């Protein structure tokens, strides 16, 4: 994208921020294309422009989207084709302060965070609780196929164990979790089903 196109892709829209003290402040928020989650936001109020990092506000809402600030532990292994770890299924973690987008809200909340490297993370929380990152990793192993050694892709799906604990007490959910992939549509569908759970 050219600089001119980048400027055109950004505009101010009416929104609000929630401060770390719990106050809600109406303001204009600069909205870009946001292929990845923003690592900071720019606001304007009464001709006063301010920039906020995740540690400086609790959340913000703009363009029918809500982002919450969180300090989380993310799985940061290489995720692009051609860069996957070989013979190493162990997750690698790093702490980061992020703006996570709320995808499904209620008693059980689902969030998404797409990093600057375009790695997609999903996070969960109960109402009022801290966010927890769902753990998933793609990796390669050597496998014999027709007598030849080839690389085969496997997946560490710890997130399914996390979700079984998270939805404990909801009848029939274990079977649904077992077939839920680590992708936005399937996870959103799973969380939407929870609204029908008697617990």
Question: Which residues are covered by each model-predicted region?
Answer:
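Compositionally biased alpha-helical segments
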Residues: 8-199
């Amino acid at each position: 994208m050219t600089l001119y196109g980048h400027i055109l892709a950004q505009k101010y829209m009416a929104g609000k921020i929630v401060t770390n003290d719990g106050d809600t402040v109406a303001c204009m928020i600069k909205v870009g294309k946001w292929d990845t989650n923003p690592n900071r936001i720019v606001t304007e109020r009464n001709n006063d422009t301010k920039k906020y990092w995740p540690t400086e506000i609790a959340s913000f809402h703009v363009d029918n989207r809500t982002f919450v600030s969180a300090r989380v532990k993310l799985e940061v292994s290489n995720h692009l084709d051609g860069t996957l770890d070989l013979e190493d299924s162990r997750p690698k973690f790093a702490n980061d302060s992020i703006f996570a987008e709320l995808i499904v809200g209620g008693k059980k909340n689902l969030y998404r965070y797409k990093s600057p490297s375009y790695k997609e993370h999903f996070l969960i929380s109960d109402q009022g609780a801290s966010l927890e990152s769902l753990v998933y990793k793609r990796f390669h192993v050597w496998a014999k196929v027709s007598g030849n050694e080839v690389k085969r892709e496997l997946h560490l799906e710890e997130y399914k164990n996390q979700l079984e604990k998270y939805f404990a007490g909801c009848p029939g959910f274990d079977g649904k979790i077992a077939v839920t992939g680590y992708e936005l549509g399937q996870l959103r569908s799973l969380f939407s089903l929870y609204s029908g759970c008697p617990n």
